[in-house]
Every structure is written in structure tokens, then in C-alpha cells.
Design a protein with these regions (language model features):
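Glycan-recognition and catalytic cores of secretory/periplasmic carbohydrate-active enzymes
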Residues: 1-411
């Protein structure tokens, strides 16, 4: 079993870093009012209730906050905060997680008589339309919080969302989900990234449908999970990744830095549930892809091409933090140290780019996401996205407490 010491790090230093990062959510990045104040909403997201949402974007040069998709970002932050609470016992983290979950529960269809009952308003690329992936990616935080608090309300919201997704978004028998839903017309519309012949995407994110099956015993959830996994095995290219599907760019051969995490990591869950090694082999290929894409200093870039070349700017620290979670889970299954060196480089890189003593108080504790290309001025090129800090907290919490590494064991 991998420990902090195996990475050449001191446990108290990793713990201190994780606590500082979690405090960034609880004390700095979380909206504390029902309406927006200092934050900008450039995408004109139609949320009516903002309290508890994580302000996910911070442009250091302008000192401005904004949002991209606060539903799924907040859901993942809730998961990070619950994990940080379990590791530390700091009540502030659990309170912040509850506040984040309240935002999600407010922003959904909660009337059982409404045809869209269970729908969560995961506004993302279009301010008036819901991304299917955003719904899926917000749910794990609710599962973690339900277990931590004993409050079944959160699990009930997960099941209601899965019912909506299974009936409205999933294309039966295909492993494909329709992507973008307009609640005002109650219809799916073309995604901004639509390509001819691409009906949707095989969304396996967080293995949520398998977790839903393990919680409820509903065979339909399990069927959807495995049909999606099979579709991903069919369409996998390059090994351990999926350039065919957005947000990767098949025309230019650009791979998204978290795709191998969203779709490769649940293959570990498929293996643990089914005992079929072909799923584990796919997860290993995803883990191996990350070792090849990782830069020598431990980081990762937003635009990594199929040939593993990159651009000079546009780092994406969240990608290597996600890789760390996958590597930890794979080594837990293997019982060996296959990914120890890449994991060591990744955690040390994240710790190096953490703001521990900034002059700007909005930055304290967060992980630097990316360095923007020059624009002709001498303004700070730093850009903060909450995702780097979210997945860093998740990764370090799992590193510090091994019992949280294999998630389907926790349902």
C-alpha cells in the first residue's frame, strides 16, 4: 500500500498543504450570498440561487471572479471537502460541503409532478441549456456527503437525477448520452461541439450509474454503465484515451487533459464489479497515457497532442491531479508501485505551484491552474481554475487515507 513516505514527502507537510487548499474553498472561493456580488457571469448562466457555489475562475491580472460550470465544479468541490473533513475532522470543511450541496439541490427540478423531475441545472457552454456530463459530474459529491452526514436527501437527489438521465438523455442500447438539453423547450439541442454523425458521447464519468446500481439494485443503471463502458472500449484511441469525442479535438489530434480520468478511471470500478480484466487493462492504458503526457517536472498541458507534443503555454494542473487519483487507485488494485515515480512528481509539482504566501489574499491556498500566453502587456499571466485545487485535495486526501481510494467499496 502506497504511503506519503513512499513519495519522499513528510505526512505533516502534505496534510498542511491539503488543509490550506481546502480552506481556499471554505473561506475564499465559495459564494456566501444567494445572489451574486463581486462575481461576473459571462456565460449568462440562468441560476437563480448562488449560495454555496464555487467561484471557479479567477483572472489574477484583473482580480476578477467568474464561473464556467458551477454545478459540476461545486459537486466535485463538495467531494473534496468531505474527503478533507474525513482526513482532518475539521468541521468547517463539512459545513462548506453542505453549503455547496444546498446550491445543487436548489438548482434542480424538485417537483415530482414535473416531467423533468430530477433534472439538475448543469448550465455550462450555453447559459440556458444543461450539459449531461455536468449532471453526472456533480453527483459524486452528493454521494460522499450523504455517507458523511447520514442524510439520505443527497442520495435521493442522485437517484432522481439518474432516473432523469436514463429516461431522457441515454440512447437505449448504444452506450451514448445526448449532450445538451434546453429545459425551456424540454428538448435536446445540438451541442456547440456537434459534428456530423456524432449523436452524443459515452459518458462514464465517476462510474455514477454503477454506484447507483450498487445503492438501489436497479438493473437498468448497471446495464447503462456497462453498455457505456463497452462503447468506450470499442472507440478507444489512442490507447488509454478518446480523441474521437469532445472536448478532445479529433481534427487537430488534441487530447483533453481529464478525459482519460473521466472515462479511464471508472474502468477500475468495472473491473472490481465484474472481475473482467479487459476493463482493468483499459484503466492501465489510461494510467500509462498520463505517464507519457506528464512533463519532466511533473505537470501537464491543456493541449497535449496524440504524438505527446504540447504548446508552450496553457498548463492544466487539474489534469495531473486527476492522474494522481487514477494512479493511486491502480496501485491499490495491483498492490505494486508501478506509478510511484509519476505520482511523486505530480504531487510535488502541485505543491510547488500552490500559493502559500501570496500578496493577493484571494489566492491563498489554491493551486495554480495555468500560465496564459503573453498578450503584449506585463500583466500577470496566471489563471486560476478551481479544478486544480479540487482534484489536488481529492488526490492528497486519498494519499493520506487509503480507505478512500477504491470508491465502489464505499457504497
Amino acid at each position: 500500500m502506497i504511503t506519503v513516505g513512499d513519495l519522499g514527502l513528510k505526512e505533516d507537510k502534505v496534510l498542511e498543504s491539503m488543509v490550506l487548499a481546502a480552506k481556499w474553498f471554505a473561506e475564499i472561493a465559495q459564494v456566501k450570498t444567494e445572489s451574486l456580488t463581486v462575481e461576473k457571469n459571462p456565460g449568462r448562466l440562468l441560476h437563480k440561487y448562488w449560495k454555496g457555489a464555487i467561484r471557479g475562475e479567477y483572472r489574477v491580472a484583473e482580480k476578477t471572479w467568474s464561473f464556467f460550470c458551477p454545478i459540476w465544479h461545486t459537486g466535485q468541490a463538495v467531494k473534496a471537502l468531505v474527503l478533507a473533513y474525513h482526513v482532518t475532522g475539521i468541521e468547517e470543511f463539512l459545513e462548506s460541503a453542505i453549503l455547496g450541496a444546498e446550491f445543487i439541490l436548489h438548482e434542480r427540478v424538485s417537483d415530482p409532478n414535473d416531467p423533468d423531475y430530477g433534472l439538475i441545472f448543469g448550465y455550462e457552454d450555453l447559459g440556458y441549456a444543461v450539459n449531461t456530463s455536468a449532471i453526472l459530474e456533480c453527483l459524486d459529491g452528493l454521494i460522499y456527503l450523504s455517507k458523511a452526514t447520514g442524510d439520505k436527501t443527497y442520495w435521493d437527489a442522485v437517484i432522481d437525477a439518474l432516473e432523469w438521465l436514463s429516461k431522457k438523455a441515454y440512447i437505449n442500447g448504444t452506450g451514448i448520452f445526448r449532450d445538451v438539453y434546453n429545459p425551456s423547450t424540454r428538448s435536446f439541442i445540438k451541442a456547440p461541439w456537434y459534428r456530423e454523425g456524432l449523436e452524443g458521447r459515452p459518458l462514464l464519468d465517476d462510474g455514477i450509474f454503477l454506484k447507483g446500481f450498487l445503492k438501489t439494485g436497479k438493473e437498468r443503471f448497471r446495464k447503462i454503465f456497462y453498455e457505456t463502458a463497452e462503447k468506450l472500449l470499442q472507440d478507444e484511441y489512442p490507447p488509454g484515451n478518446w480523441v474521437k469525442y469532445p472536448p478532445s479535438d479529433v481534427n487537430h489530434g488534441i487530447l483533453h487533459p481529464r478525459m482519460a480520468y473521466w472515462w479511464g478511471r471508472p474502468m477500475v470500478m468495472a473491473y472490481l464489479d465484474s472481475k473482467e480484466k479487459r476493463f482493468l487493462d483499459c484503466a492501465i492504458r489510461a494510467g500509462d497515457w498520463y505517464t507519457k503526457a506528464q512533463r519532466r517536472d511533473g505537470g501537464l498541458f491543456r493541449h497535449t497532442y496524440i504524438d505527446l507534443s504540447t504548446e508552450c503555454f496553457g498548463h492544466e494542473t487539474s489534469g495531473i491531479a486527476c492522474a494522481s487519483i487514477l494512479w493511486l487507485e491502480l496501485m491499490e488494485v495491483f498492490g505494486n508501485e508501478r506509478y510511484l515515480k509519476p505520482l511523486e512528481k505530480a504531487i510535488k509539482f502541485c505543491m510547488r505551484v500552490q500559493f502559500t504566501k501570496p500578496l493577493n489574499p484571494n489566492l491563498k491556498g489554491c493551486i495554480l491552474s495555468k500560465v496564459l500566453p503573453p498578450d503584449g502587456s506585463d500583466k500577470s499571466p496566471y489563471h486560476i481554475r478551481d479544478l486544480a485545487t479540487i482534484f489536488y485535495v481529492q488526490a492528497t486526501a486519498k494519499l493520506l487515507e487509503p480507505k478512500y481510494r477504491l470508491e465502489i467499496n464505499m457504497i
